[in-house]
Structure formats: structure tokens, C-alpha cells
């Protein structure tokens, strides 16, 4: 009987990166790592520039040297498309969408969730997904789909701190952790003050 396909959801943050490292270290089946890049417009990535450089110049080449195939997904729509698009239903129909709201980000749904869902529909039945959720994130672990989603961090007893240290020791810790404890687009409405400060100080072209 042929084994199911195994994929790792990978943002190239510490938890998903550590998941891939654990899979390789323990001989867990892994067919590919899947990354979805949100775009600001057709040319500019939504990733903080340091993280995007890390992904394409360090992380993806490292995974490929390990024998891990990396799939990069992008939505047809960009942040600018959504910002300038018009609402098509409801009492605000016809109005320009403009800025995304905290806790209700259309960019997350249209530019990340949908391309991932489309890709998942192309996978064979029974595909198993590794997700980067640490042992000390119990609320998130409880939401995993039994049998279809697996946390290798939980399986091998790794906390978020352990994941950070594993990536650091492997030379695969994103530089964004120097100024933030989370990943996210540089235009994210949920960005914390240190992230906004970093953007203003180091990427004034994006701030403007």
C-alpha cells in the first residue's frame, strides 16, 4: 500500500523551519515544504525585506540541499488590488475597500488562505500536513485535524524557545527575530510598534 503524501506548511519562521529540521533529523516522511508569499503589488513582496531575503537566499537553498522540494504559492490578487478594489456586497457595496482592519484582514483570506486551499485541493486524498505548532501552544494544538495535521514540535517535545534554539544552531533563524517575536507582512494591521519602528528606520521606501 502506497504511503500518503506528507507536506510541511512553511512560513520560514522558527516553528515551521524547526518542523522541517525535525522531520529530516528523525527520518519523518516529507515530500515538500509549501510556502505562500503574499505580495504588496506585482513586484514587491509583502514580507519584511530581511525575511524575504532570508527565505530566497538562505532557507530555500538550505532545504533544497537537504532534498526537500519547496513549493512557492502566490495569489492572483495583491494587497494593492484589494486596497483599490470595491466592495461587491452588503450595505457598503461600491465603496473602495481601503485599509484592512485589525482582526478582520481580507489580505490574509484572499492572498494567503485561498491559494493554499486551491493547492490543497490538488493533493491526493489522505495527504498529511505538518504544522509548526509548539508543545506550549495547547490551544492551537487542540484545533488540529486529527490524522490530517501533525505537529512534530509536539511529538518531539519542542517548545517555541526550543524551536528558536534549533533554528539558531542550524543557521536558519530568520533575522526578523532581532526586532519582533512574530512573522507577518510589513503592512499588517496587527503589526506591533517595534515592527513599525523597524520599517520606518530601515525601509522608508515601504513606509512611504
Give the location of each predicted region:
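Nucleotide-activated chemistry modules centered on ATP-dependent adenylation/adenylyltransferase
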Residues: 1-208
Amino acid at each position: 500500500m502506497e504511503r500518503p503524501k506528507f507536506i510541511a506548511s512553511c512560513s520560514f519562521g522558527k516553528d515551521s523551519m524547526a518542523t522541517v529540521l525535525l522531520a529530516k533529523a528523525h527520518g519523518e516522511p516529507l515530500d515538500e515544504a509549501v510556502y505562500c508569499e503574499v505580495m504588496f503589488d506585482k513586484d514587491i513582496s509583502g514580507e519584511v525585506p530581511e525575511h524575504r531575503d532570508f527565505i530566497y537566499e538562505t532557507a530555500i537553498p538550505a532545504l533544497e540541499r537537504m532534498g526537500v522540494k519547496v513549493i512557492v504559492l502566490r495569489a492572483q490578487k495583491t494587497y494593492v488590488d484589494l486596497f483599490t478594489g470595491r466592495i461587491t456586497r452588503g450595505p457598503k457595496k461600491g465603496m473602495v475597500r481601503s485599509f484592512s482592519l485589525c482582526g478582520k484582514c481580507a489580505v490574509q483570506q484572499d492572498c494567503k488562505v485561498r491559494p493554499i486551499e486551491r493547492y490543497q485541493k490538488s493533493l491526493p486524498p489522505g495527504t498529511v500536513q505538518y504544522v509548526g505548532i509548539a508543545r506550549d501552544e495547547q490551544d492551537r494544538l487542540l484545533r488540529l485535524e486529527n490524522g490530517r495535521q501533525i505537529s512534530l514540535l509536539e511529538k518531539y517535545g519542542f517548545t517555541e524557545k526550543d524551536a528558536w534554539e534549533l533554528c539558531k544552531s542550524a543557521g536558519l533563524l530568520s533575522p526578523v527575530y532581532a526586532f519582533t517575536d512574530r512573522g507577518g507582512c510589513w503592512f499588517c494591521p496587527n503589526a506591533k510598534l517595534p515592527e513599525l519602528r523597524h520599517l520606518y528606520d530601515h525601509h522608508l521606501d515601504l513606509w512611504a
